[in-house]
Amino acid sequence: DKPDLRIDLTATNVSSLFAGSAFEVLADKTVKAVAISNCALTRKQIDKLLADVEVQTGSKACWVKVDENGNLTGGVSKFLTDCKDALTAKLNLKPGSFVCMAAGKKAVAQKTAGVIRTMLGKRIPGHFDEEQYALCWIVDFPMYEIGEESGALEFCHNPFSMPQGGLKALEDAEGDMDKLLAIKADQYDLVVNGYESASGAVRNH
């Protein structure tokens, strides 16, 4: 929730491509892919990237390249033959493209993909503009989430924030888990170049 917008890469949700897949690493999980074209990373550089991602996030990432004939090669390519065409179309892959993927529970995959995006953007020339200040407001935070360990309803960020729609939003959602999870918090962050520089909220009243 604090993207560095100086980087022009994006993380794409490709989870649906691996629903029911025989490849358990990606099957039936949230899968986020960061694709980059004309990538000349060596195997040593790729291994270093994956190692650095694991150190920072505690999660493993996987990768494939696209060869001059448009075929997937390297990394986990041998497990992706069934979804090669769909993955190529979804990510608009071309010869020379490199794809790095993160998989797991939603929050884990999102965090890991964010780290992959940042590392690739800063390591490969042409994808990171150091000369600009990129500011953005982060809004519409979910009020609640299902805790990954507890399995129960938990506050996502700040329990003292007012829900968007006021107390009526809570009253209308009482007893309905889907409605509770759809409630947004009335809070914000201001992000500058990937760093949270300010935050605020309407407090409960």
Please provide the spans of the model-predicted regions:
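Class II aminoacyl-tRNA synthetase catalytic cores and aaRS-like
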Residues: 1-205
